[in-house]
Amino acid sequence: MSRLEQIFKDAKAEGRAAFVAYYPAGFPTVEESVENIIELSKHADLIEVGIPFTDPMMDGPTIQHAADIALENGFKVKDTIEVVRRATEAGANCVVMTYWNPVLQYGPERFAAEFAEAGGLGSIIPDLLPEMAGRWKAACDENDLDPVYLAAQSTTMERLEMTTHAGGGFIYAASHMGVTGAQDEVDKGAQELVERCRKVTDLPVAVGLGVRDGKQAAQIAAFADGVIVGSVLINATEQGTLVEVAADLAAGVRAKA
């Protein structure tokens, strides 16, 4: 069992889902992102450290806005390594969420080695399909990193089986069709997607895209192994309420509505 899987196993042993928090490195500055990620890690079991990118295909306006601010403030891909290093030293568990282009430009083998050395546990690369990920998979294997893949409601069972077998750590189940961003209601297809994933894999299944508050987190925690939250944490950062929002979400995950 990988270190990433163990995080979900430990949460399950406590009778709850894992709380997974997405936060972009460099937002609003590198130093502040380190501080905020460390603060989040007091509430979240796992941090998805995002790499700001100029052309994100999956990110909604909130995360795009955060990426723009980070890039305007001079963020570089190499800063991700330092953010993860410092967060890990403070006790955070980190995976990276990025698009393939920044990793490719940096050098996949170099990035994997440096990220793992900094304490990283795995990667989520939405635009890198398993059948195209041979080079990255080799780099992950070499550095004991889990490549995490996404599953959507539109994914066929055949495709789902292939994707889950290729991945590691956990499965990222997209709770609704479209880009990231807080939603008013939990998509009814999310639970069905989790059940479909469980038919073809023993990996934990975490649900993301659209969680707005503790109440929604509790609804998802009732059927998923993990609850992934992102956009609302960025909004909370700008409103000065990150600690309160993180605590509310953590309580929701543990409540299981």
UniProtKB/Swiss-Prot annotation:
Keywords: Amino-acid biosynthesis, Aromatic amino acid biosynthesis, Lyase, Tryptophan biosynthesis. Disulfide bonds: none annotated. It catalyses: (1S,2R)-1-C-(indol-3-yl)glycerol 3-phosphate + L-serine = D-glyceraldehyde 3-phosphate + L-tryptophan + H2O. Its EC number is 4.2.1.20. Pfam families: Trp_syntA (PF00290). The alpha subunit is responsible for the aldol cleavage of indoleglycerol phosphate to indole and glyceraldehyde 3-phosphate. HAMAP family: Trp_synth_alpha. This is Tryptophan synthase alpha chain.
